[in-house]
Amino acid sequence: MTKGKVDALLGIVFGDEGKGKVVDFFTPRYDVVARFAGGPNAGHTIIFDGKKFVLRSIPSGIFDEGKTNIIGNGCVMAPDLFMAEARELEAAGYDIAPRLHISRRAHLILPTHRVLDRAYEAAKGKNKVGTTGKGIGPAYSDKAARVGLRVGDIEENFEEKYRALKARHEQILRDLHYTDYDIAEEEKLWMEGVEYMRRFKLSNTEAEINRALAEGKSVLAEGAQGSLLDIDHGTYPFVSSSSTTAGGVCTGLGVAPNTIDRVFGIFKAYSTRVGSGPFPVELFDETGETLRRIGHEYGAVTGRNRRCGWIDLVALKYAIMINGVTDLVMMKGDVLDEFETIKVCTAYKKGDEVVTEMPYDTEGYEAVYEELPGWQTPLTEIREEKDFPPAFSAYIAYLEKQLAVRISIVSVGPDREATIIR
């Protein structure tokens, strides 16, 4: 029997690339869909059977009863938020418990992690990262410090373990002079979520995935956020706390590097970023506001305005390199329909220095642009590549030449049918 392979589907910039729609498009082709990193800080918006769902922790293959869905060891979970997300799916008629397996090695986000998140951000003042306040960073900090609680801990002597870690957090909060909080109601709901999680299959998911591969089954590793938010390779310290790149697939699921076949890198036809941190292509003018308005650039979980700018080839080349991207997926081409001229960032400049490779720190750099003609033709109803306006085809060809990777899929609208395979 031919051994199965893992394909990775990754956002390769700052997240919010439209992974949810693409995952929904991809999932019928795979037997297993697995989340390998992150937690309820990022949402994938899925339209299924005419209904809108925002999935934060649950993999996007959950709507298909024939799929196995896995929350891998590289993820962090908030039981109360997981319960709310799962109950919404159950209320819509989906029997998700038989389809969803949760790694015992995934770490838990405690209510006090969320308080710590707020306390740390407050202490940073103007240097704050701009976290979602979901407790992600403190949970991963405890993981690295080897004091965290894992999903497997809820199976035995959990109350004792919980109280010990909670006491540790409370001492840290006292040291930070951050004492104005009350988690009594939140903690009650959280404990209800812990009990709810016990309904699901808590397992050694790395063994499950490798058994599936040995049986010739196909696995889709569903990324969260984006490569430039990776804890190692992102715009540190304005990053997430997990490994969001292709390397994170191996560590976050327990699969070997040689099991990875194709790496699909998702990006938008322009650039966005949420929260703090350097963003050389950011537009503060009417063009930036137009991109935000047409692209509906507001966070799926937080509702925060996304910062907008032209496409950034310096960032994309870097992300393609560190991920080994084999196929590119371009989203939201239709958002650029109105523009007479489209700019493309090909380099960064600081004083007399011009760089075309991603610097150690992009703070203080400005974008250097080339200009291309716009197509000024609506793309949303187009379903075949042969019907693309010539200027849009030229834009795609230009990007492929610059990035040296084929753009295999182009999205020109929110509907699934507006996803065109080339």
What are these regions (language model features)?
Residues 1-422:
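Non-transmembrane, aqueous-exposed alpha-helical and coiled segments at domain scale
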